[in-house]
A protein has these predicted regions:
Chain A
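A short, ordered amphipathic alpha-helix with a cationic face
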Residues: 18-24, 55-58, 66-67, 79-80
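General structural signal for secondary-structure boundaries
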Residues: 26, 43-45, 76
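Metallocofactor- and cofactor-centric catalytic cores in central/energy metabolism, strongly enriched
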Residues: 30, 35-54, 58-59, 66, ...
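A short, structure-level motif marking secondary-structure boundaries and short turns
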Residues: 14-16, 50-52, 74
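N-terminal first-folded block
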Residues: 4-36
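Helix-rich interaction surfaces within compact, conserved domain-sized segments
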Residues: 13, 65-105
Length: 105, 410
């Protein structure tokens, strides 16, 4: 675990770089986190996903799965993979300041 | 007179009926079990059918043979469950009112979730082995197959029995070797996970087995669609994998009746307390086995360990006592590895599979995270244990909670 400064605010991050506390996150941090994931520019489509994830996390208390983003968020799976290549659930959660999604056994 | 309703008479529901029927006071409680099918399938046996080790007759028995005699059994499809009104409506119009309900409606494959899967070539050169129809159709294909490229693909997690697809490729390696055509068969294991299995130590151990057996591992592959015409499996990112024979482990989902009743998540699994097994939404509803949304394996062994905890919690609920948060995610899986050998893993929510001896620390006779002949015999003997002890709710010499005794930290 380490602390880091994102958009001028000091936050705690876990070993893989996910924010420890989702409440530390501000929208200003997203572009920096996105760059760390290899995404240079966040478009409106990216923001639609990020905002859905934030809102769903607030309501449900867990990071939404790809299927939940499709069913509840109305975001086609194909779009998710185009926007966040190689692991959209993990990357989008990272940028949205949420913890790493729990894998299943 | 109060009414306990058990919805689902598969492994989990049958075990629960057998445990509760002898102990609930019959002057105060009656028990009804609802299921829509008459036949009980020994699902762990499906794995062996494509290789001609088991046939259909080896894995089926009438469900009624396993229900206790002093409960009511209704064989009929359910229209809808209305937990806010404590009642269940059957498709034939009957209405069943309950005081306490246990849901054990399981999970099943849903190949239609993947574009192009259910075309003309479904069960021609694309098969599942999680249904009796799929496993027997695949047997007929493999019996006469002269070789080519076999791709085994897990579409998405979670799936029932997460080790079964690995066992399938291990057995394929053995079978085609025995048939003398292993050099004509390419085997590729394609998974959305970052490795052969979820947990790091077991993933490494099982990954080495794949390498040793000359099975290609393609990880981080999220299957998006099947192009049946060109025998190609595509990921969501348009990576292409060609096959001659595609064995798919399709999307697993809970029962449609759970979806229709608004009781489940996106996959029709029911939000459930991971330690007490009580529904998160309805106090008088408990959930058991594959029907839950728990981050545990969907497997008979898990249902068995859950049943021990639920047996106690149902009695506590009835007696107005606080529930015991005793379920720890314990799973215990024999992994058939081919050539008459097997591997055993034992783990829970927090502790990943570790090497050691089981069930007696230091003695065994089974070995954890090691390949032995004894583990294979454990797997083959399990069918007898399943029909004669497990379903009947008998005590097995294994604690519901996982123990560290006999395990080695690595």
């Amino acid at each position: 675990m380490a602390t880091a400064t994102l958009a001028g605010i000091t936050v705690e991050r876990d070993d893989e770089g996910y924010l420890k506390n989702p409440n530390d996150w501000t929208e200003e941090m997203a572009p920096e986190l996105a760059k760390e994931m290899g995404i240079d520019t966040l478009t409106d489509e990216h923001w639609k996903v990020i905002r859905f994830m934030r809102q769903d996390f607030q309501e449900k208390g867990q990071v939404p799965t790809i299927r939940r983003m499709k069913v509840a968020g109305g975001i086609p799976v194909k779009d998710l993979y185009n926007l966040f290549p190689k692991g959209p659930a993990k990357k989008a959660a990272y940028i949205a300041g949420l913890g790493k999604p729990h894998g299943c056994i | 007179m109060k009414h306990l309703l058990i919805v689902g008479g598969g492994t989990a529901g049958t075990m629960m009926a057998n445990k509760l029927a002898p102990v609930l006071d019959s002057d105060q409680w009656r028990i009804t079990l609802i299921d829509e099918h008459e036949t009980h399938y020994y699902q762990p046996g499906f794995l062996f059918i494509p290789w001609g080790i088991y046939n259909k007759q080896d894995v089926i028995k009438p469900k009624r043979d396993f229900y206790p005699s002093n409960i009511d059994v209704i064989i009929a499809p359910i229209e809808i469950i209305e937990p806010d009104a404590n009642r269940v409506k059957l498709a034939d119009g009957r209405v069943i009112v309950y005081d306490l309900m246990i849901i054990a409606t399981g999970s099943r494959i849903n190949p239609g979730e993947t574009e192009g899967m259910l075309g003309d070539k479904w069960h021609k050169n694309i098969f599942d082995f999680y249904t009796i129809e799929g496993a027997t159709a695949l047997r007929n294909f493999i019996k006469y197959w002269e070789g080519g490229k076999m791709v085994v693909n897990v579409v998405e997690m979670p799936i029932k029995c997460p080790v079964a697809p690995l066992e399938f490729v291990f057995l394929a390696d053995w079978y085609f070797t025995e048939q003398g055509i292993r050099d004509k068969v390419d085997i590729e294991y394609v998974t959305p996970l970052p490795g052969a299995f979820t947990k790091p130590i077991a993933a490494k151990f099982l990954g080495e087995f794949l390498t040793k057996k000359n099975i290609k591992l393609t990880s981080d592959f999220s299957a998006g669609r099947v192009d049946q015409e060109n025998n190609t499996l595509y990921s969501w990112e348009e990576e292409a994998i060609n096959y001659d024979l595609l064995v798919t482990i399709p999307t697993n989902m809970g029962s449609e009746v759970i979806g229709r009743s608004g009781m489940g998540d996106e996959l029709n699994f029911i939000p459930t307390d991971p330690h007490t097994l009580q529904s998160k939404k309805w106090d008088n509803v408990f959930v058991l086995g594959d029907a839950t949304d728990l981050p545990s394996s969907k497997a008979g062994s898990v249902a068995h360990f859950e049943a021990d905890v639920l047996f106690e919690n149902i009695q506590r609920y009835i007696d107005g006592r606080p529930l015991k948060a005793a379920f720890d995610g314990h799973a215990n899986c024999y992994i058939e590895s081919g050539f008459g050998k097997g591997i055993l893993i034992d783990f829970n929510y927090d502790v990943e599979p570790l090497p050691g001896k089981f069930p007696l620390p230091g003695i065994g006779p089974f070995s954890l995270l090691q390949e032995t002949r004894m583990n294979h015999w454990g797997k083959m003997t399990f069918r007898w244990v399943y029909w004669n002890l497990l379903l009947k709710g008998a005590e097995l010499p294994i604690e519901a909670q996982m123990t560290m005794a006999g395990k080695k930290r690595v």
